[in-house]
Amino acid sequence: MSILFNEEEKIFHIQTNNSSYVFCVSDYDTVEHLYYGKKIPDDNVKYVSNRQIYAFHAHESRDSRKFSVSSVGLEISPFNSGDFRTPSIVYNYDGQLDCNRLRYRFHQIYKGRKSIDGLPHSRNTEETETLEIVLSDDERNIEITLFYTVYASVDVIARSQKIKNGGTMSLTIQKLTSMCLDFYGMDFDVITLEGMYLYERAQISRASLKRGVFKNGSTAGLSSHNHNPFIALCAHNTDEDIGEAYGFNLLYSSNFSEEVSVSNLGDTRLMIGLDDTGFLWTLKAGESLSSPEVIMTYSNEGLGGMSRNFHDHVRQNIIEKEYAFQPRPIVINSWEASYFSVTEESILGLAKHALDCGVDTVVLDDGWFRSGIQSGLGDWRTDKARFPTGIQGLSKKIHAMGLKFGIWLEPEMVNPDSDLYRAHPDWILSTSKLPLISRQQYILDLTRDEVVNYIANRITEELQGVELDYIKWDFNRYATEAGSFVTPQGEIYHRQMLGAYKLFSILKERFPVLFETCSGGGGRFDLGMLYYSPQIWTSDNTDPYARVFIQYGTSYAYPMSAISCHFTKGDCTSGRESTYEFRYNVASLGTYGYELDLSEYTEEDKAEFKKYSQTYRKDEDLILQGDLYRLLSPEKTSFCAYMKVAKDKNKAQLTFLELQATGFVETMVLRLKGLDPAKAYKNEETGCVLHGATLMNVGIRVGDLVRNKRSAGYSVTFPAVD
């Protein structure tokens, strides 16, 4: 069992393979956090609780000053209940902001897990166990359930909560987090993934905690290019390989909040959940509301160990089993080749060139139903002038060539110049007669079932008979004036996301193919999207030098198989030149494809591309199933280096990228990581055979990698040998 309960002491001890999470029910029926960290024996650790009562701290008993909720760690912290730290839940009953006192009532432990209403979540597995803690506010008949689902083999605990109004009057929720976690002490650095459009997650922000509140989040109606739902706490001396690291990530794709606060006593509180800016959710009698799920992991093997825990969990328990460990398509996308001028003739020409390059899937991007950004979204009607046989006929021709076929959609949007908008101007998110516009489009009001069903049916009708293998789902603007003609204002953002998830579910059931999501590049790169699509377009920035930073940061929280990386023209966003080999080595960190006009390249070029496609297929098992070890950070050096290592340690691949000419790259010695110390490995470049222990301690000379000194990007494979 992963979940232990000491009935006499009322202590819960959640164990994974390498971590322990311990909390208890206090003498006053509050749920008190005690410990999270390296795995420990099942001892009574109540002694760590702070029973000191400080001046102005309220305490439970008039006769005793032994317990104050302001002094101890808590699993949930209601507002106005004696805890003066940032609350994790705020609600009022019948318009009164009452004292939100919550008491433990009962718990249950069981194999498996429950789904979360309308929300993505970690999937059920044979090893999964769940603990439910039920608390109540008896004065108002309000019930809150805390969920802890354990994935022991990957050192992950998934947390969420559910609030139910058991009373007779309305309950208004002003703040609902997914988890609250308290630590005694503040000796932490906080790490987040920051960025912007064309530079998502490229800035790894790390700072020491100080007294006060640190907040990371989004209010844009999506997880955003600027901030990511991942956050980590680590010791000051933690690096890639050594030290304690706690990682957290929210399975959600809209507005979120991550708050880290340090109290006057120097204790640390982390809360993650729905952003409460403008949030106001009403529960009528008998109704309930579930929070999104947070996954959390602990590692004492540095940030690299934390990342590998996340990678394993996402691949094993979030991405659909059908795709998680299966070869992915090598695609050619029409956008960089044709933009809005794409035609049936041009896409068939692109397909012919693709056959010469080892590509197996042709993706028709934006332009199949319109010639610019001004119109077409929402109507989804094929431009028969440019596609005379329709998408159905085109897909059949692509299949006849021995290729697979994919198509681009943006189902959540509508153009003002569309039949749909003219017929239903009230079907958009807006609070104004003159709504703000972005990219010549509005966001459809998916809080309304009739809108969700209409879009699902319109797309289904248009794609009827198409021989479809792949769908790219885009989302190209932020939400502004987010209001609805039918939905309460304070519920808009969350109901909108629930509607989007519903639309995903409908279309995935009707089109059981591989989905790849996108949002102006990586604006919705989160675990909520990975529940529906096994890979995400990482960024619209296809400059390989910039992609090094983007992909490196993304790898902190997301597995290689989720990071969509393509070989590109190389200079389309920055003008910087790069060699083919450098571009391939950058793109081979994740799932592979091409973003360029193949007709512009020679037969020799296409032969080179085919070689890259074949190399990718040969090494794809490392991307789908292997472990990632980061060796050199591009933020700290002029280089980037990482290793992909098979789970059985029988194969490894080193990639080294030179971002700036330094003149001493050939003199560098690089220590490898992740190998089996006792196994011998052959360097396929030099033929040299050395033991893993030697390669990880002595290292290799980088100059031995250099074949073409102008490349600046090198990879070498190390198979284990007898």
Regions found by a protein language model. Give the residues of each.
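C-terminal beta-sandwich/jelly-roll accessory domains of carbohydrate-active enzymes
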Residues: 660-722
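Carbohydrate-binding surface patches
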Residues: 231, 240, 633-677
